[in-house]
Amino acid sequence: MQVSVETTQGLERRVTVTVPADTIDSEVKRLLKEEYRHRRVNGFRKGKIPPNVLQKLFGREARSRAASSIMQSKYFEAVMQEKLNPAGAPAIEPKVNEPGKDLEFTATFEVYPEVEVQNLDKVKVEKPAVEVTEKDVDNMLETLQKQHADWKEVKRKSKKGDRVTMDFVGSIDGEEFEGGKADDFALELGEGRMIPGFEDQIKGIKAGEEKTIEVTFPEDYHAENLKGKEAQFVVTAKKVEARDLPELNDEFVALFGVKEGGVEALKEEVRKNMERELKNAVKAKVKEQVLKGIVENNDVELPKSMIDQEIDQLRKQAAQRFGGNVEQMPDLPAELFEEQAKERVKVGLLLGEVIRGNELKADDEKVDEIIATAASAYEDPQEVVEYYKSNNDMMQQVRNLALEEQAIEFVLEKASVKDKKASFDDIMNPKQQ
């Protein structure tokens, strides 16, 4: 077998392979003898078809099969021989495939780039210094109360936290516009669902009152015809309701499966859940900064085949997110996902090199810690732990996650890390800040 390698452009390689004629001719004869002679052919008994008849009837098909099989196997041999590291599937094309002649084919593919991770000391990370306070726990309990509250009609003016049911008609320059009208629309004041200024002017309204309010649509509003436009809404309040919060007592506590210890036991359970969620959120924020830092401080040539694969994955995820059948939905344009795909590929290559270059191995304690953290959210943690450990696929996912965390920790040891004081809401509810 003769092999030559050509760099066509960037990471693309074209391998030309020549296989001796007797190799493919022998495979064709084998196929004809072992498989095709058992075919049914009029005038011949099964298994008794002469070689010349087999060659005439099935020679072309047998040669095509033999060539396909040999090209695949010889491609892998050539890649190993030349110490190439393909980043995607090859495009294999036969050049010479005739009886009695050497089989010649080309395989075109991209190779993984040479990756060197540098400038880790230039990676800057602000690590949130935060803990769950008593006030945070009380706020969470109040949120739970609100989720289980009843709405009761009140006869006073509306205020923040109330729910106002209204009819409204919107107009611009005296003309009603599409989407600007609603009946029996329920709005909780303080949620920020409406355009700026709308809720503020609803506060203080009473049931039965009609009011005209003036607002300006934001410049980045989704409807092109409304961007930056001044509008008037005639609002008729039909009902004002206030939340009737349930008392913090044993009956309320029982809603959350707490059987003993009353309110204090619920508070402790809430605190534990908040601390677990906060720990994960802090870890995610740190990871985001680390990945951004290594991407910004390292250049890597990206294989197009890897970017295309990542685009396909992102496209499928988008279709699933919107509840569509991936096969039935039309292809979303690749451009929508290209930048995200490039970043994912670059992150994968850089983190992979951190792991490979520093000979990191999945730490058993780290693996157990990840499983224990995941299991702690369930009623029977031990059952979840046993499920993980009995499932090879799940364990491999956890080992990969552990390796990723260890790579992040390795970078953090070299990076410039500063603590930044923060509150629970800063981390968990940043949009509300």
UniProtKB/Swiss-Prot annotation:
Limits of the PPIase FKBP-type domain: 161-246
UniProt-annotated location(s): Cytoplasm
Disulfide bridges in this chain: none
Keyword Mitochondrion recorded: no
Gene Ontology MF, one: peptidyl-prolyl cis-trans isomerase activity
Enzyme Commission designation: 5.2.1.8
InterPro entries linked to this entry: PPIase_dom_sf, PPIase_FKBP_dom, Trig_fac, Trigger_fac_C, Trigger_fac_C_sf, Trigger_fac_ribosome-bd_bac, Trigger_fac_ribosome-bd_sf, Trigger_fact/SurA_dom_sf
Keyword Cytoplasm attributed: yes
Protein origin, superkingdom: Bacteria
SUPFAM superfamilies: FKBP-like, Triger factor/SurA peptide-binding domain-like, Trigger factor ribosome-binding domain
Any one GO BP annotation for this protein: 'de novo' cotranslational protein folding
Chief location: cytoplasm
Family annotation (Pfam families): FKBP_C (PF00254), Trigger_C (PF05698), Trigger_N (PF05697)
Catalytic activities: [protein]-peptidylproline (omega=180) = [protein]-peptidylproline (omega=0)
Domain comment as written in the entry: Consists of 3 domains; the N-terminus binds the ribosome, the middle domain has PPIase activity, while the C-terminus has intrinsic chaperone activity on its own.
Biological role: Involved in protein export. Acts as a chaperone by maintaining the newly synthesized protein in an open conformation. Functions as a peptidyl-prolyl cis-trans isomerase.
Family under the similarity heading: Belongs to the FKBP-type PPIase family. Tig subfamily.
Name of the protein in its database record: Trigger factor
Encoding gene per record: tig
